[in-house]
Swiss-Prot record:
It comes from Mycobacterium tuberculosis (strain ATCC 25618 / H37Rv). Keywords: Molybdenum cofactor biosynthesis, Transferase. Belongs to the MoaE family. It catalyses: 2 [molybdopterin-synthase sulfur-carrier protein]-C-terminal-Gly-aminoethanethioate + cyclic pyranopterin phosphate + H2O = molybdopterin + 2 [molybdopterin-synthase sulfur-carrier protein]-C-terminal Gly-Gly + 2 H(+). It holds the Pfam family MoaE. CDD domains: MoaE. The keyword Transferase applies. Converts molybdopterin precursor Z into molybdopterin. This requires the incorporation of two sulfur atoms into precursor Z to generate a dithiolene group. The sulfur is provided by MoaD. GO terms for molecular function: molybdopterin synthase activity. The keyword Transferase applies. This is Molybdopterin synthase catalytic subunit 1. One of its GO terms (biological process) is Mo-molybdopterin cofactor biosynthetic process. The gene is moaE1. Pathway: Cofactor biosynthesis; molybdopterin biosynthesis.
C-alpha cells in the first residue's frame, strides 16, 4: 500500500507521495448502476510554456487539500443523480510520464460522467492548495501562486 499523506473517507480521496493507482480510483467509482465511467490521468510532460521540463515537485498542505477535495467531490456528485467521483493526487518529486492526478467519475449515463470528470479537474486546478515546482535544464521555479 502506498504511503498515504492524507485521505478522506468515502468518497475516495487520497493524497500520497507514492505512485497512483488507476485501479483503485476505478474501483471506487464502479458499480452495477454506473453505465458510464471516465478516468482522467494527468501526467508529467516534458515541456511547458515553450521550455523543457525535466521533473516536477508537488508540495501540499494535506488537511486543507483533503477538505477542499472532499468539497469538490461533493459538488461534482451533486450535479446529477447517481454521479460518483474519486480523486488521487501525488506529492513530492515526479518524473516525466508519472501520473500526478487520477480522477474517476461515473454515472448512470456517459454525459454526466464526462461532465463530472471535467468539473472535478477544473475545480481542483482552481481551488486545491497543491503547489508545483517545475525543473528544467536552466533551473527551477514555482508555477502559479504559492503562499
Amino acid at each position: 500500500m502506498a504511503n498515504v499523506v492524507a485521505e478522506g473517507a468515502y468518497p475516495y480521496c487520497r493524497l500520497t507521495d507514492q505512485p497512483l493507482s488507476v485501479d483503485e480510483v476505478l474501483a471506487a467509482v464502479s458499480g452495477p448502476e454506473q453505465g458510464g465511467i471516465v478516468i482522467f490521468v494527468g501526467n508529467v510532460r516534458d515541456h511547458n510554456a515553450g521550455h523543457d521540463v525535466t521533473r516536477l515537485f508537488y508540495e501540499a498542505y494535506p488537511p486543507m487539500v483533503i477538505r477542499t477535495l472532499m468539497s469538490i467531490i461533493g459538488r461534482c456528485e451533486d450535479k446529477a443523480e447517481g454521479v460518483r467521483v474519486a480523486v488521487a493526487h501525488r506529492t513530492g518529486e515526479l518524473q516525466i510520464g508519472d501520473a500526478a492526478v487520477v480522477i474517476g467519475a461515473s454515472a448512470p449515463h456517459r454525459a454526466e460522467a464526462f461532465d463530472a470528470a471535467r468539473m472535478c479537474i477544473e475545480l481542483l486546478k482552481q481551488e486545491v492548495p497543491i503547489w508545483k515546482k517545475e525543473f528544467s535544464s536552466t533551473g527551477a521555479e514555482w508555477v502559479g501562486d504559492r503562499p
